[in-house]
Design a protein with these regions (language model features):
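Short, acidic, metal-binding catalytic loop of nucleotide-sugar glycosyltransferases
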Residues: 59-67
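Conserved donor-nucleotide/metal-binding helix-loop-beta segment in metal-dependent transferases, i.e.
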Residues: 144-173
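Short beta-strand/loop segment that forms part of the nucleotide-sugar
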Residues: 68-77
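Active-site-proximal specificity loops/subdomain of glycosyltransferases
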Residues: 38-44, 48, 80-130
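Short beta-strand-to-loop acidic/aromatic patch adjacent to the donor-nucleotide binding site
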Residues: 131-144
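Short catalytic/ligand-binding loop motif for oxyanion handling, primarily in non-cytosolic enzymes
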Residues: 19-23, 78-83, 106-107, 142-146, ...
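A solvent-exposed, charged loop/short amphipathic helix patch at secondary-structure junctions
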Residues: 18-46, 162
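Short loop/turn segments at strand-loop or loop-helix junctions that form parts
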Residues: 10-19, 24-25, 101
Length: 173
């Protein structure tokens, strides 16, 4: 009997510190905002940082220890996570990688900066060293109990959860 090794699974976390003065300057420049004026969807409170990245990272390390690498994707920012990982998960420090938008937008630099999470998530496949199977987190998503690879993948395919809903007119059939 052939011994098949389970595929490696990585985690990718999208993160931004919306209170970073340099980020705010870039946003104002590209969104052509006047100081203290917001566009719908670009309100300051939407990007406030409450250390979500640290909760997210610790939850992954604690409840999904089988994940091989964790990539934190950001735009010229430092999430300052290494001291926390060193303190609580010292053997995992080398598994945490900060990835700048410049890396994933290589060849598409003219589209930077971008503040659009859809654009960013569409470029994650360009992360160097990323496994074919990975779990994508926003920094405000946390794992709250132990998981295993089959929580996310079965037969090398992603597990989808939720309910299929019929359009209202089909419910009467």
């Amino acid at each position: 009997m052939e011994n098949k090794k389970s595929p490696e699974i990585d985690a990718v976390i999208a993160w931004v510190d919306g209170s970073d003065p340099e980020l705010i300057k870039r946003q104002q420049k590209y969104l052509k905002l006047e100081p203290n004026k917001n566009l719908p969807g670009a309100q300051k409170t939407r990007f406030n940082s409450l250390n979500e990245i640290k909760y997210c990272l610790i939850s992954i390390l604690k409840f999904a220890p089988y994940l091989r690498k964790i990539f934190v994707v950001t735009d010229q920012q430092d999430p300052n996570i290494y001291p926390l990982v060193q303190k609580h998960f010292p053997k995992r420090v080398s598994d945490i990688h900060i990835v700048d938008h410049l890396e994933i937008f290589e060849g598409f630099e003219s589209f930077l900066p971008t503040f659009n999470s859809i654009c960013i998530s569409n470029m994650l496949w360009k992360i160097k060293g990323l496994s074919d199977q990975f779990i994508y987190f926003n920094d405000d998503v946390f794992i709250v109990r132990p998981t295993n690879p089959s929580t996310f993948f079965k037969n090398n395919k992603p597990v989808l959860r939720g309910k299929w809903r019929l359009p209202p007119y089909e419910r009467i059939l």
